[in-house]
Amino acid sequence: MRSAKLKFEKRRSRIRHKIAKTANRARLSIFKSGRHIYAQIIDDTKSVTIASASTLDEKIKKLKKSHCNVENATKIGELIAEKAVSCGVEEVVFDRSGYKYHGVVKALADAARKKIRF
């Protein structure tokens, strides 16, 4: 268990180090809990959250009991991309926060990639 958490932390720090080099672009950050998925677009130069979406939003909340799945991740990706475009954000850098690029993370990224550039 400790080695899995250690691998996660190493992956997370490696990703954050690469993202820190691209300070001129906004960051699309994701977080997964046991029941929900959260995505937010952050401007690191101003330390401000530009837009956010999650399975707690009213549009997605009433669909299913289980919220942390691929189907809802695609809807969150589309929703966060729409909010980003409406706020004037065209290009972001994807911060997967140490999670492997598979399943829910991949579905969210692919859905968001249809409207905004990574």
Curated annotation (Swiss-Prot):
Cellular component, GO annotation: cytosolic large ribosomal subunit
Entry keyword set: Ribonucleoprotein, Ribosomal protein, RNA-binding, rRNA-binding
Keyword Nucleotide-binding: no
CDD domains cross-referenced by the UniProt entry: Ribosomal_L18_L5e
InterPro entries, alphabetized: Ribosomal_uL18_bac-type (IPR004389), Ribosomal_uL18_bac/euk (IPR005484)
Single GO molecular function: 5S rRNA binding
A single BP term in Gene Ontology: translation
NCBIfam families: L18_bact
Assembly and oligomerization: Part of the 50S ribosomal subunit; part of the 5S rRNA/L5/L18/L25 subcomplex. Contacts the 5S and 23S rRNAs.
Xref: PANTHER family: 39S RIBOSOMAL PROTEIN L18, MITOCHONDRIAL, LARGE RIBOSOMAL SUBUNIT PROTEIN UL18M
Family affiliation: Belongs to the universal ribosomal protein uL18 family.
Annotated function: This is one of the proteins that bind and probably mediate the attachment of the 5S RNA into the large ribosomal subunit, where it forms part of the central protuberance.
Name recorded for this polypeptide: Large ribosomal subunit protein uL18
